[in-house]
Amino acid sequence: MVAIHTGAVTTNQADSPATGTRLSGPILEVPLAPPQPPAGFVSSIYEQSWEIDRPREEVWAWLCDPSTFVDGQLPPFRVEFLTNADGETGFNEGVYNAHVGPLMSFSGVLGTIEAERYRDLQYCYGSYAISHALFRPTRLQFWLDDGPASTSDHPSTTLHLQLDTYVRASAVGIWNRLMAVFWKRFGSWCERAIPNNWLR
């Protein structure tokens, strides 16, 4: 888990409210979402893999380019990246990320990132799809590896996704069908966005 900013506040309890000094606790360091689903919800793990006929470094560059997700958003949908403690933005560890719009609010913090191998995004409690009473995503992870048939002349990449969500128990089937439709073309979007230089 990536630590959120922490701090300590020194107070003098002898100070009176008239001085303008108020008691203030430290910024908390806790998991972004509860470890167990709330009552009436179950843990759902949706996974999907794609075989992409592009080099792994280029698939990684596409996956970790903010413009891949920012460009093309139609208002009022919006994707934001806010700087981490080191002043970095984009896909870097500790960067705050939000994808918001009608019927959705996915807000979280980027976790461990290993170049060309792994990317982690952990969602904050309160994130939801369609309704907070139905679908509450908690984590989105991607893994990359060379494709099983990858060669130096014809490179390919296996891209694997895992989305962890707390789902209303009665709506698990609906969620799985929605995810199958939503993610179906993700791999082909990636492939079309990267020029197939190995064919040229």
Regions found by a protein language model. Give the residues of each.
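Short structured motifs
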Residues: 45-46, 78-79, 92-94, 124-128, ...
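Short, hydrophobic/aromatic-rich segments at coil-to-beta transitions
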Residues: 7, 12-18, 87-96, 116-128
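Short, hydrophobic/aromatic-enriched beta-strand segments in well-ordered soluble domains
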Residues: 48, 159-163
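Hydrophobic pocket/interface hotspot
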Residues: 59-69, 96, 110, 121-125, ...
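Hydrophobic ligand-binding cavity/cleft-lining segments
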Residues: 2-88
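Short, P/G- and charge-enriched loop/turn segments at secondary-structure junctions
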Residues: 33-37, 96-97, 127-132
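A conserved amphipathic terminal alpha-helix motif
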Residues: 164-200
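Hydrophobic-ligand binding "helix-grip"
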Residues: 12, 71, 100-156, 164-166
